[in-house]
């Protein structure tokens, strides 16, 4: 029998906790036998003293095991269970293409996603722009969709990693969110509860990233790869660029539209293509669906070219109660804003920098995200035709097209866009879409 205060004292004094001590504490969080004050105290000691790799693995596994873990064995699937997690960004719509692309190549992708957080958009919010789309199918239906379609994107249910929910709520109000072992545990507890064979992590770097510096993004990626592999799931991570909006759009309906256009080949933003392909390649290799980069890319390009990936997306939408002809008639179903017009810069020049975070917050301010959980979202608002770093801007080339609910909202967004995009008299050096691949 352990005492919570003795576990806190041990960590406070700089000692490593045992697997049993960590499990006792995490189960107590779940069962409400550990108080909020005790959770806060342990979180703060971990914040200051860090955790060893074995402690990090134990913490993650204990949080995963605080709820149900999905088991796919009974379905006798003929491919690997694989997924991707992103630390979040602006215009990061990769999940909507990646899931169907990997499923079309023989993987099974049971993606449990989140809502928007701060300046970052949420995959669930984007999908809810599709009329009727059900993000909470029951467990049996979720399994059926994975078996039949190969991919489903759903919200986190209360049975998955319940200890994390309470732990995170306390961290949020005690300035202990930005601790790498705690972030790692929180992310992976939910992902590992999916019963995965392989995982790829997309860790963003830059002005729209969750972590404020390249070094911290790198440290988080290395921690996640180390812990997930320690927990028995083949995992790699990519450090990808978030110094500009990733897609050509930012919002909900506008990003869904771009995802469909990407899958059908109607329009593919080159940076979005680079990042999506790179993540899919990792999933195919880790899932043993391809032996190397070249084979993986060839398979992925084939399912884009022959329409199979778009077909899988359409089947997923229909299986999750959206329209059965969504891919063919997306504009008929997606909401459109009352006012859509371009915003131009006040001067001419090349785009040298972008405050991606501020652009994400501008979408939230227009009603495209939540400031608090109870807010309702206006799925129609956002930006399209986003200019990119290095673009030459003048009276002919707008910074973006703003989709707003009225003139006042448009004016506020236009002011935010102009303030967030910096022009210079010479073009900046180009930045890669993918900085680094981390395998251990």
Curated annotation (Swiss-Prot):
Homodimer. This is Thymidine phosphorylase. HAMAP family: Thymid_phosp. PROSITE patterns: THYMID_PHOSPHORYLASE. Pathway: Pyrimidine metabolism; dTMP biosynthesis via salvage pathway; dTMP from thymine: step 1/2. It catalyses: thymidine + phosphate = 2-deoxy-alpha-D-ribose 1-phosphate + thymine. The gene is deoA. It comes from Salmonella schwarzengrund (strain CVM19633). Its EC number is 2.4.2.4.
